[in-house]
Each structure stands twice: as C-alpha cells, then as structure tokens.
Amino acid sequence: MEFSSHAQSNIFNVKNGQITFFSSTPIENIQAKTQKVASAINLDNGDIIFKVKINTFEFAKKLMQEHFNENYMESDKYPFAEFKGKILNPQQIKGNGTYNVDVSGKLLIHGITKDYITKATIVLNNNQLSTISNFDIKLVDHNIKVPSIVGKNIAEVIQVKIAAQFNKVEVN
C-alpha cells in the first residue's frame, strides 16, 4: 500500500469515521456503533485502509458490550479490526461529484483474514471526501463463536455500515 505524499496529494484521511453493525433476529435486534475509525484513501492508486479498536463499539446495554468484548470478539486477544484494499476503479474519480465504486481487499477480524468485495459511494467535494459502504459479515467466516444459549438472539450474518468524512492531507 502506498500512502507517501507528493506535491499534488490525492490522499485523504480521517480519525473519527463511523462503523455501525446490526444483528436482526426474531427474538431481538442488536446494534452497536463506534466513531473512532481511522482511515486513509489514496485516490491516485486506489489504496484504502480502515482500522478500528474493537472495544470502542458502544451498545444500548452495557451487558451486551461486555459480552461482545469478552466472549465473542475477545478484544483483549484481538484488539483491532482492519480492512486493507483497493478501489478497483479509482481513475473514474475525476473532480467533484458522487461516484459508485467497487472495493476489494482483506478484512481482519478476530484474528481471521478474509477477502471481501463490496460497493461504496464516494462523494468528492474539493478538499473533502465522504464514503459510505454497506456489507455483510458472516460470524463463522471470522471464527466468532456464539454460545448456543444465546444463539437465537444473535444473527449469523451481521450487517455493517461504514461512513466517514475525510479531509485532504496537506503537503508542506
């Protein structure tokens, strides 16, 4: 991944991006959110990275947050989730506008790395860039085990939404 700056920087970063996830079952819905996502995007070559500390996700119920960190995600053992990838068609992003792009990369969660391809929307407006992406994660793909006693309360597939407002990296 290449994020070195040059005179005409096309690199954008953010330290307070947002990730929400949603689990829907007939018994209960569970939602969590963090606004502590760090990310960088290089529009010249399409490189993209997102990184989040697992224990920053907040739940409506403290007990859910505790179970999430201690029992399911084991956030002491696996403190971060990270996506490294590429915008597959970065050359289409020319000037201000809204762009629908394909993103491919590797998602590391719970010590397991899997390949993902998803769609994202990028809005470029001068020195600011915003992104939105929605995708699903299967718990089994990342070896996240849910005890059978609560298995009906947690979906096997979690809906994830990433949204971030980036600023252009200033070059000295």
What are these regions (language model features)?
Residues 1-6:
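C-terminal segment of classical bacterial N-terminal signal peptides
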Residues 7-172:
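Low-complexity, acidic/polar, glycine-enriched regions of mature
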